[in-house]
Swiss-Prot record:
Involved in the production of the bacteriocin subtilosin. The keyword NADP does not apply. It comes from Bacillus subtilis (strain 168). GO terms for molecular function: metal ion binding. Induction: Transcription is highly induced by oxygen limitation and is under dual and independent control of Spo0A-AbrB and ResDE. This is Antilisterial bacteriocin subtilosin biosynthesis protein AlbE. It holds the Pfam family Peptidase_M16_C. The keyword Zinc does not apply. It comes from the Bacteria. Keywords: Antibiotic biosynthesis, Bacteriocin biosynthesis. GO terms for biological process: bacteriocin biosynthetic process.
Length: 386
């Protein structure tokens, strides 16, 4: 087990989270695994409340997501620092998360609750055309549904799962115990007296390479209504935090922030575009461009986007504005324990601290940004009609 301790006096709380990492290729039945994990996490929450009191478990959370090339399952809690609540025993709670005890089975009620919760999350993802289209593009580009909608889960598969599958959860427990485990602790903690503490945290790498390029997939939900297009650009090798900052600034200048170069470009071309936004997907290393337009214009959009990216230019004033927006965005992220804890993986991916990341923004020049955008490559688009 690896323990990542991030000492900070920034918060009056301590956050503790246990994570389980599994290569995507070995996730044979992700729906069943996620249902069990959701049910087990609800059980763990009750165990923690019974052992340490309501304050220790009231902010308990759990999730299952994509983490670069791995499936990440996390459960954790946030509690008041012992300085302000002497009844909380942090050392004992850390050891509880280090040695999690999973339920040997799930009751019918626990199964139903976990399955319905997962179905609701999937439904929200599928009904959001922007999120869904981006996921479909990723799975087409990388040739694996687990990089896209497969990570959400398959609704028909989930509905077909019988509660008897969880009367004996031995195989789920064995699977979780065999995975790479991390214990992440954030707060004013002097030391971590946990068995198996790794003095050096492992590096986070992401070497995924697109297997399909020039993708153009379409799905029709309705013959009426607008189309949502998601175009993807492969950002190549991200060598360090400096490259990460550059692509974040490009993202901001192109479409994420108010002075959108793409929206200006479409307005000048007299195309009926209702919505334009960009997003850098760090897990898939893709710059995504999402556009909502009339169905009759969807063929005109990709060449216009490529034209705008190839002709991209920025000046010092625009870049400084984007830098300030990015600083504010990161400061807001780092201003909550959950936000900072969620960002720890990104910081480890680029081997930097949050202070170094913020300081590195100032060093980027217009020339750096223009040189970097010239290296990204268009890989295709996905369209959802109606």
């Amino acid at each position: 087990m690896e323990v990542n301790l991030l000492k900070t006096h920034q918060f009056s709380t301590i956050s503790i989270a246990a994570s389980f990492l599994k290569p995507i290729e070995s996730a044979a039945e992700p729906e069943e695994e996620t249902i069990y994990f959701y049910g087990a996490a609800a059980y763990l929450k009750e165990q923690i409340i019974d052992a340490f009191g309501y304050a220790a478990g009231s902010r308990f959370m759990y999730s299952a997501n994509l983490f670069f090339d791995q499936q990440l399952k996390t459960c954790g809690t946030r509690l008041i620092h012992p300085l302000y609540n002497g009844n909380l025993h942090v050392d004992a709670l850390m050891k509880t998360f280090a040695d999690l005890s999973f339920p040997s089975s799930l009751s019918f009620e626990a199964f139903e609750k976990a399955r319905n919760e997962l179905l609701l999350k999937i439904e929200k993802k599928f009904t959001d055309p922007f999120s869904y289209s981006a996921a479909r593009l990723a799975e087409e580009v990388f040739g694996n549904p687990m990089y896209g909608t497969g990570m959400f889960g398959r609704r028909d598969r989930i509905k077909a799962i019988h509660p008897k599958r969880f009367l004996d959860a031995t195989d789920f427990i064995v699977d979780l115990v065999s995975q790479q485990k991390q214990l992440n602790i954030l707060g004013q903690v002097q030391a971590c007296d946990v068995r198996g503490h790794a003095p050096q945290t492992s590096a986070v790498t992401s070497g995924r390479i697109p297997v399909n390029r020039h993708v153009f997939e379409t799905e029709t939900r309705s013959a009426a209504g607008p189309s949502v297009l998601t175009l993807g650009f492969d950002c190549g090798e991200m060598k360090d935090a400096s490259d990460y900052i550059k692509i974040q600034l490009i993202d901001g200048l192109l479409g994420k922030y108010g002075h959108s170069a793409l929206f200006k470009h479409f307005r000048e071309k007299d195309l009926a575009v209702y919505h334009v936004i960009t997003r850098y997907d760090v897990m898939n290393n893709l710059l995504l461009v999402s556009i909502c337009t009339d169905q009759l214009h969807e063929k005109d959009i990709p060449p216009r986007v490529l034209e705008a990216v190839s002709a991209f230019h920025t000046d010092e004033r625009e870049l400084e504005q984007a830098k300030q927006f990015l600083r504010n965005e990161l400061l807001l992220q780092f201003d909550s324990p959950e936000g900072l804890l969620a960002y720890m993986g990104v910081l480890r991916r680029f081997s930097c601290t949050k202070e170094a990341l913020l300081d590195g923004i100032s060093a980027v020049t217009c020339r750096d940004v223009l040189q970097f955008i010239a290296t990204i490559n268009y890989i295709g688009a996905h369209v959802v009609r109606g």
